């Protein structure tokens, strides 16, 4: 069984080196090219899908659309869930990463970005960036909407969705592609591969490059490779 993961193509805020999180930004032109290239590589590799999953953020949705279009699979059913959203960067969202490092120190910012259990500064209740002000989350219990997340909290929302919704599809023999974000995918990869809390700090997932897992009957990885050529 094969599972394909893809981080969205470069976004406008990736390009500007800003913390993005749940803020909804579009793909940059380079990100569009990355997504289209990913779709072409998937087609060349002969990978076919029966069902697709993505977040409710534009950059991931558009990446998936380009992938399906370029691989001639636009008809594949797509399921969108906030549980596949990027990690919520709290009060860091919209800030420049370099300027934040100069203000708080590179080590502190690295912990905020890569540590498993260090929370970023949280959004204030009345901050206009609060996701509760976004219509796409209007059906969620307000207590479920974060004001900031670390990777641990991100994993705690991603993995139940994997277990309850995505994994059963794979076990039924359906071929799955997931287009999501750097940290929601890091959380899933941590779970699939059993990566330790400290080791996960070093894991980087590139934008717009399909990651193919070959899974056994227990959905444990037996092989993985990037379609980067």
From Swiss-Prot:
Enzyme Commission number(s) of this protein: 5.4.2.11
UniProt xrefs under Pfam families: His_Phos_1
CDD domains reported for this sequence: HP_PGM_like
Name by which UniProt lists this protein: 2,3-bisphosphoglycerate-dependent phosphoglycerate mutase
Residues of the active site: 8 (tele-phosphohistidine intermediate), 86 (proton donor/acceptor)
Biological classification of the source: Bacteria, Bacillati, Bacillota, Bacilli, Bacillales
Catalytic reaction list: (2R)-2-phosphoglycerate = (2R)-3-phosphoglycerate
Family to which the UniProt record says this protein belongs: Belongs to the phosphoglycerate mutase family. BPG-dependent PGAM subfamily.
Organism field: Listeria monocytogenes serotype 4b (strain CLIP80459)
UniProt function note: Catalyzes the interconversion of 2-phosphoglycerate and 3-phosphoglycerate.
């Amino acid at each position: 069984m094969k599972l394909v993961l893809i981080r969205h193509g470069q976004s406008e805020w990736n390009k500007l080196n800003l913390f993005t999180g749940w803020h909804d930004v579009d793909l940059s032109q380079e990100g569009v090219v990355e997504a289209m290239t990913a779709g072409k590589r998937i087609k060349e590799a002969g990978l076919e899908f029966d069902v697709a999953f993505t977040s409710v953020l534009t950059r991931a949705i558009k990446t998936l659309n380009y992938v399906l279009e370029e691989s001639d699979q636009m008809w594949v059913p797509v399921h969108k869930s906030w549980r596949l959203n990027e990690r919520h960067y709290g009060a860091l969202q919209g800030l420049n990463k370099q300027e934040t490092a100069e203000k708080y120190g590179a080590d502190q910012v690295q912990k905020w970005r890569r540590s498993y259990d260090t929370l970023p500064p949280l959004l204030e209740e009345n901050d206009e960036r609060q996701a509760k002000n976004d219509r796409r989350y209007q059906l969620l219990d307000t207590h479920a909407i974060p004001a900031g997340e670390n990777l641990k909290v991100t994993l705690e929302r991603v993995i139940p969705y994997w277990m309850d919704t995505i994994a059963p599809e794979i076990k039924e023999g359906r071929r799955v592609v997931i287009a999501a974000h750097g940290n929601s995918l890091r959380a899933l990869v941590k779970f699939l591969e059993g990566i330790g809390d400290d080791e996960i700090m070093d894991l980087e997932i590139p934008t717009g490059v399909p990651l193919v897992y070959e899974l056994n009957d227990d959905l444990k990885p037996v092989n993985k490779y990037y379609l980067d050529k």
